[in-house]
Amino acid sequence: MNENLDLGNLSTIPIAPEGFKSGFVGIIGRPNVGKSTLMNQLIGQKIAITSPVSQTTRNRLQGILTTDKAQIIFVDTPGIHKPHHTLGKIIVKNAKTAINSVDIILLVVDSSVKSGGGDRYIIDLLKTVNQPVILGLNKSDQQTEKYQEIDESYANLIQDHNWPMIKFSALTGDGVETLQNTLIEQLEPGPYYYPPDLITDQPERFIMAELIREQILQLTRQEVPHSVAVTIEKVEESPKITKIFAAINVERSSQKGIIIGQKGNMLKAIGTTAREQIQKLIAGEVFLKLFVKVEPQWRQSNLRLAEFGYRVEE
């Protein structure tokens, strides 16, 4: 398996040379503005799942970028929105906690559309922070001939703040290097927090479960995705193949039927694509067995939320 995804032996952390910079950057914004896509682009490997469905990210996920001059720990936070259930409240609380625990805040917005109330709400939250803030205008590849009008709408939002504004496309990578260099300029001198070859603080099992959930988000109907939690029940490793047994937990029997599909075709499609993604992750052959379980109202149960890995960050 790819050891770069585990914390490994922290004794491998080197002493930082003179002038080396490091720090934590919180990536925040409304749901579905491309925060996770940006994280993957910055790190150079897929560690955060993406989908057209809003509120895809549920847990805080740290991605680690190490260069010769700096180490940046990116904290990909869930989209800040008005919550409608216990899980939603935990998600938003964790995102707000992240704002207060990082060295730099990267506020990502969707520059293919004008600024809106959700952006103003987040900027109001940031009025009292002491950390530097950078406004990132994502989706520059989707801008139309009205881009100047759109850019101006965001510039007006931050006219009372001395925040740099950088345009980029997390999807194509255009402008991301400029963003990275700006972040490094804002960092203070500091140590290595993690070994240089580490790219995330999350264990492989977490990433595996997320890759399975991503395919559910991509392939099932709108009413199913937010009711799904994936848990890795067992992993059996051998020199030739890694066997993974995972449970897909839903709230209603009707959702179980949708996940399984006619003659099991949907579950097969989810498993096939997820297996391909996991094979890329661990650089080896994978056997993936999926089960579907009904856990009524798990999003409202603190016990079930804890069992499925969702907790309030302190």
UniProtKB/Swiss-Prot annotation:
Region (G2), start-end ranges: 55-59
Family membership noted in the UniProt record: Belongs to the TRAFAC class TrmE-Era-EngA-EngB-Septin-like GTPase superfamily. Era GTPase family.
KH type-2 domain segment(s): 212-296
Protein name: GTPase Era
Species, as recorded: Crocosphaera subtropica (strain ATCC 51142 / BH68) (Cyanothece sp. (strain ATCC 51142))
Subunit annotation: Monomer.
Main location: cytoplasm
Purpose of the protein: An essential GTPase that binds both GDP and GTP, with rapid nucleotide exchange. Plays a role in 16S rRNA processing and 30S ribosomal subunit biogenesis and possibly also in cell cycle regulation and energy metabolism.
Organismal lineage: Bacteria, Bacillati, Cyanobacteriota, Cyanophyceae, Oscillatoriophycideae
Protein encoded by which gene: era
Topology in membrane: Peripheral membrane protein
Region spans: G3: 76-79
Segments of this protein annotated with the region G5: 168-170
Superkingdom of source: Bacteria
UniProtKB keywords: Cell inner membrane, Cell membrane, Cytoplasm, GTP-binding, Membrane, Nucleotide-binding, Ribosome biogenesis, RNA-binding, rRNA-binding
